[in-house]
Amino acid sequence: MSMLRLQKRLASSVLRCGKKKVWLDPNETNEIANANSHQQIRKLIKDGLIIRKPVTVHSRARCRKNTLARRKGRHMGIGKRKGTANARMPEKVTWMRRMRILRRLLRRYRESKKIDRHMYHSLYLKVKGNVFKNKRILMEHIHKLKADKAHKKLLADQAEARRSKTKEARKRREERLQAKKEEIIKTLSKEEETKK
């Protein structure tokens, strides 16, 4: 059997692949050995004596299966961990995510007129100061603030109504007293006139 190194090299350059991917027909070695140019190699490829081997399968099925399992939390125990907690999930990244979520919520509430700009500003600073652990707590805080505000407004309205009521009552009382005084003065003046 003759060496077919040259033919393999020529075939790999024609097929534009590695020498490992070139298959030479073992039954036609003599014919292949005679070919010593690109043109002849092209003819052999056309005839099917030289073939480019298909790409070897590198399956990702196992990898996909493991990834799905990891999403559920499998294979993630203490024994599988190499880096520190901060290296695995940086504190800065979690902080940025939380800030973006909370600030987005505040912006949405301000745009939909659920909170005014003053409340927005104070809550924005509180968010920055790490007051709220998550979105739910911030929403509860906003609802509580709004409820307190509504309650204060109700109390203020009630107090105002009470004040106006007492004011009106005082005014009526004064009017009654004034009318009584005028009546008494009239009766006294009449009596004096009759005496004369």
Curated annotation (Swiss-Prot):
Q: How is it modified after translation?
A: Citrullinated by PADI4.
Q: Which residues carry this modification: Citrulline?
A: 5, 16
Phosphoserine PTM positions: 13, 164
- Glycyl lysine isopeptide (Lys-Gly) (interchain with G-Cter in SUMO1), cross-linked positions: 181
Question: Which domain of life does the protein's organism represent?
Answer: Eukaryota
| UniProt keyword Ribosomal protein, yes or no | yes
One GO BP annotation here? translation
Region described as Disordered: spans on this chain: 158-181
Q: What keywords does the record list, in alphabetical order? A: Citrullination, Cytoplasm, Isopeptide bond, Phosphoprotein, Ribonucleoprotein, Ribosomal protein, Ubl conjugation
**Annotated Gene3D superfamilies:** 1.10.1200.240, 1.10.1650.10
Q: How does it assemble?
A: Component of the large ribosomal subunit.
What protein name does the entry list? Large ribosomal subunit protein eL19
